[in-house]
From Swiss-Prot:
Belongs to the class-II aminoacyl-tRNA synthetase family. It comes from Rickettsia akari (strain Hartford). This is Threonine--tRNA ligase. Its cofactor is Zn(2+). Its main location: cytoplasm. Keywords: Aminoacyl-tRNA synthetase, ATP-binding, Cytoplasm, Ligase, Metal-binding, Nucleotide-binding, Protein biosynthesis, RNA-binding, tRNA-binding, Zinc. It is found in: Cytoplasm. The lineage of its organism: Bacteria, Pseudomonadati, Pseudomonadota, Alphaproteobacteria, Rickettsiales. Homodimer.
Amino acid sequence: MINISFPDGSVRQFENDITAYEVANAISMSLAKAAMVAEINGELKDLSTVIENDCKLRILTAKDSECLEIIRHDAAHIIAEAAKELFPDIQVTIGPAIENGFFYDFAKDKPFTPDDVAMIEARMHEIVKRNEQITRELWNRDKAIEFFKSIGEHYKAEIIASIPAGEQITLYRQGNFIDLCRGPHAPSTGFVKHFKLMKVAGAYWRGDSRNEMLQRIYGTAWATKEQLDNYLLMLEEAEKRDHRKLGKELDLFHFQEEAQGMVFWHDKGWSIYNTIEQYIRKKIRKNGYTEVKTPVLVDKSLWEASGHWEKFRDDMFALDTDDKTLALKPMNCPCHVQIFKQGIKSYRDLPLRMSEFGLCHRNEASGALHGLMRVRSLVQDDAHIFCTEEQITDETVSFCKLLTEVYKDFGFTNISVKFSDRPEVRAGSNGTWDKAENALKEAVEKAGFTYTLNPGEGAFYGPKLEFVLTDAIGRQWQCGTLQMDFVLPERLDASYIAASGEKKRPVMLHRAILGSLERFIGILIEEYAGCFPLWLAPIQVAIATITSDLNDYALEVQKALIDNGVRTDINISPDKINYKIREFYNQKIPMIAVIGKQEQENKQVTIRRLRTTEQEVLSLEQLITLIKEENEKYL
């Protein structure tokens, strides 16, 4: 007798071995028809899986979030089948589910054209209509290698050859197509109804630039038409907000081939950058941080001692000089430990909060670079808190409060937290990890956050919190982090004198709020769609004259504004006023001060605000006071 327990607490008994599908059918025919996969003792399995022993069982349908990845994985198999039917000479390689969709890499002599992609998408819909049964097959490894070689699929044969000898191979068959896969999959292709192919890109075989270039087709797939439509609308809006496009239109920054992954900041973009730095500097000073500056180029011996050389060597820029190897720092933490070690530290000196706008360099692959979001040269709003174990909770709560204030000032109120606990490969004892994880959990709960668990995703030296923002169009951005570190102080021999008189290692909290300033500015450009709030806008007020005989007064207004720290632009050309206003609106300047004869006579300006048709007449003093008060809230 087999006892099967269900999520509602009920238990059913079955006399003989039974498949998950048969269990679903025993509950109701409608459930069996909608069922996609089964969760057996916490693991996702095909519905054809035979249940031989007592277990816990969930039958999952498209309404369950876990099935979205199944739908996308099925879609990857369907695109491969469609492409093979239309282009029999191509080879299929790999095709996983990814965030928001799927992709498949193909080896094809000629590039896929837009017409080819449209044909593949149409054939995918045909395969879905066929509702082909998807079946799991176990194969002998050597037999599988020979089979794929015999049908000209040499990439698949190579993948299987890398699997240890003697292991069974899992293949999935649908119609005349068969693919290597661990699964699970839905019972048939008919479950994948709502998808769209998005683009074609190049991808190296096995992600290695020394290998041949393949063609990758990306797609998106969703459980419902409404979800698909909403996603496509979001992409359309995201395209309008693309920071690379707006960065060019608003004259903020540019990139060029001679300095890949390095930002050329223009005057307006650099204004935003400096304003953010000024804002953060004010915040951290109020919260008891000191600010330091450490070298950019450091001997590799420090990176070897810290463990970064072994772990991140391939991502570091290094050069040999005077029989030494120097490396551009990829992060600031080892340098901050060097400052901590200067002079004897007492428990009375802790917590010590050390911040730096640290210039770091990371050797990102050229294909991974993406505007401001992924660069090789970056500045982090980095800080390290050296504290005792007893201070961990209070310091974490204090950091969470500061982070919440900062995000709110930039307009982000929807913040979620991911808690990443111990990875399989880690430094430190289980007891140390228990203590660290419990302290972080207590602190994040005390700070008023709920969190989702990211099992095994902590750093090798300690658990971490990741703070995720949701933007105006529903996208999520991981920005802030707090990582606990018991290892680096040990490796770099940092210590303090405890109240007992003995030497102890401080705990090191690595923390950032914005992450890299470059990436955060990219996020802000897209969040605001280029319409920055008054305090942050590179040009706060633009002055436009109706006629040229008002130019002297306009210049007087500009000087008064500049003298009071207001960022301004002016157009006193003979162009028509409507043209001037339109040009300033296109530059998304928050306030336009229009000057006519009446304004000159009364020492006033007429203010037009971005995104509104309302006008407001202010004296010059009122305008200056209004902007200064807004600036002082943040700066």
